[in-house]
Amino acid sequence: MRSSRSDIRRCFGCRFPKVLSPTHSKSGARPAIHGKLAPYCKRLTVIDVVPRAIARTRQRMKESSHINWIVADVRQFSTQQLFDLIVVAEVLYYLEDVAAIRTAVHNLVSMLAPSGHMVFGSAIDANCRRWGHVAGTETVIAMLNETLIEVEQLYCRGASVNEDCLLSRFQKSTT
C-alpha cells in the first residue's frame, strides 16, 4: 500500500489549485499524506481538531508558505473558499456516531467546487466496528454517493485482515 510521487500524479491526473485535507491527530499517517499532496497544489489547507497535532505536523513540513494550518473540527470547519480536491483519509471513523459522520460528510461536500474531486479512504466497516468505531468506508461511501459521482474505487488488502481498506474517488457534478 505504498505510493510514490508519480502514483499521486497519475491518480489525480493534474495539479489542483486549492486542496483541503482534514486530519485526525490519532492517525499517524498525516505528515506523509500532506507531504505527498503539497507539491501538487497551489494552496493546501490542513485542519485538525488538536492544536498540538497541527503544530507537530507543521514543524515536520518545514513551514511551507502555501500550506494553511487550521485548528478546527471537520464538522464545523467553514470557509467561503471552494476546494478543487478534498482528501479525507482515516478521519471520519473517529467521530462518535453515524449522525456526526453524516454532518461531516455534508460539510465537506458543501466546500467542494463544481467538478471538484474528493478522495476518501478508510478501513472497511468490519474492521472499524471490530476496533470499536461506529462505521468505516462502506458507510461513508454510501453517504458520498448520495450527492457525488463515484469515479473509481480501489480495494487495498493489507498483510492482515485488520489492514483492509477502500479508497474511492468522487467528483461533484457541474450542475
Curated annotation (Swiss-Prot):
Keywords: Methyltransferase, Nodulation, Transferase. Gene3D superfamilies: Vaccinia Virus protein VP39. GO terms for biological process: methylation; oligosaccharide biosynthetic process. It is an enzyme of class 2 (transferase). The keyword Methyltransferase applies. Its EC number is 2.1.1.-. InterPro entries: NodS, SAM-dependent_MTases_sf, SAM-MeTfrase_NodS-like. GO terms for molecular function: S-adenosylmethionine-dependent methyltransferase activity. Belongs to the NodS family. SAM-utilizing methyltransferase involved in nod factor synthesis. This is Nodulation protein S. The lineage of its organism: Bacteria, Pseudomonadati, Pseudomonadota, Alphaproteobacteria, Hyphomicrobiales. The gene is nodS.
